[in-house]
Amino acid sequence: MENLEVMVILFIIVILGYVACKLGYMGDKFDKKLSSMVVDITCPLLVLSSVMGDELPDRTLILPLLGVGFLTYILLLVFGFWVPRLITRNHDDQGMIGFALMFANVGFIGYPIVSSIFGPKAIFYAALLNMPNTFFIFTAGVMLIKGEYSVKQFNPKVLFSPALLGAFVAALLVAFGVHTPDIIARPVTMGGNITVPAALMIIGSSMAKLPVKEIIGSPKVYLSSFLRLVVVPLSIYFLFKVCGVSDQVNDINTVVIAMPVASFGTMFCLKYGRNPSLITEMTFITTVGSIITIPLITLLFS
């Protein structure tokens, strides 16, 4: 019941963004600037804040967690580039669907859900599992959104993107057992906390610009959403279960992967001048659907 309540609360913020756009408080120009601020400023702060608690995770788990995280995203990379070709022949749509299948809304929705299910300490493990997400979303994710699948399109500057640098610093803090002074941790945490409502309201605002028939979705949207919410997380869960990954790590990783489509999809579309309609539809449908699927998936852990 608690997990369902958290999902409903987050969805209400999406609706708030929808209403704000309809009332004229949000729109294309504002959303684009807010998206850039979330991507480049508040999200890196959110990543850093996840390792600025009183207790740090067991250092011996850092490499295993990173290993599981990277292996997960390598599998998702293959899945994200191959499966969309079976769903549609439209090149641009393939990229959008691939992004949706690969990247879950971990930083914005995943951390609160992980905390509510496994306790506040588990957010540190989720942050480590999510580090590969930060790398791949700013490399493969950008390629998918832009529709440029060649490795030649890779920009080395992405390795120095604020979000990835934030993840590197977070890993160093954990590895060396650094406890951040409260005078630094508190403003970082406050800045990072802007990410969740801002990102969700951007989704709602983008949704407000869609015709009703697009909000309702199309067969490919529902198929992609089902793959995102059910097939992908269950496949990852049972695969690592068979491979002998510890229940604690596997359970947290599964919840991380079971989140709805990452808000970065919509924000990347706005940032790179792509049509956000399809990715926003999938984000909306998966956000609504996850209210049911995430609590059901957690039944595997009981």
Give the label of every model feature segment.
Residues M1-S302:
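Alpha-helical transmembrane segments of multi-pass small-molecule/ion transporters
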